[in-house]
């Protein structure tokens, strides 16, 4: 949907392809150093930061009125992807016993994969019915909700170990 938004904001097909290539290059360049940063600051902090970056990117795509701004948020999305994807998996591995790590990560990817279809359908329906801004604002709100759920447990205390 990010690439469709770039197209909607006036980029040509070739420019969208170039933007996606640059996104992937930036992601590849940032993944290793951000993995090291996650080791230093803590996986929980990196996962929380990832939820926040995701929300910021989706707010940006909702409010972007030019392709220039949307491109900036696409490259911020590369930062999110590089920071969150590895840290999220590593954090998951801290939540289960050693003998269950591979199964837990497999289950996580299964659930994410299965839920991507209805999530994408809902996003597309929101876009068609109410416009891109409504769809992206909904995504941002859900990311902020996920961040809040991640940050606190039922007693209002921090829910992750660092």
Question: Where are the model-predicted features located?
Answer:
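Helix-to-loop junctions at the C-terminal end of transmembrane segments
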Residues: 30-43, 127-128
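A membrane-interface helix-boundary motif in multi-pass transporters
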Residues: 125-142
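Intracellular juxtamembrane helix-capping segments at the cytosolic ends
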Residues: 83-96
């Amino acid at each position: 949907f990010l690439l469709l938004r770039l197209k909607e904001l006036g980029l040509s097909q070739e420019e969208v392809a170039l933007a996606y290539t640059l996104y992937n290059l930036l992601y590849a360049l940032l993944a290793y150093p951000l993995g090291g940063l996650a080791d230093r600051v803590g996986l929980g902090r990196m996962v929380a930061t990832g939820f926040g970056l995701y929300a910021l990117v989706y707010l940006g795509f909702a409010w972007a009125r030019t392709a220039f701004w949307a491109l900036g948020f696409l490259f911020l999305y590369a930062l999110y992807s590089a920071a969150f994807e590895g840290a999220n998996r590593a954090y998951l591995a801290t939540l289960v016993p050693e003998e269950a790590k591979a199964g837990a990560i497999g289950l996580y990817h299964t659930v994410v994969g299965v839920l991507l279809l209805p999530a994408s359908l809902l996003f597309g329906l929101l876009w068609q019915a109410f416009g891109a801004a409504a769809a992206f604002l909904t995504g941002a709100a859900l990311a902020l909700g996920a961040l809040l759920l991640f940050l606190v447990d039922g007693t209002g205390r921090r829910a992750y170990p660092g």
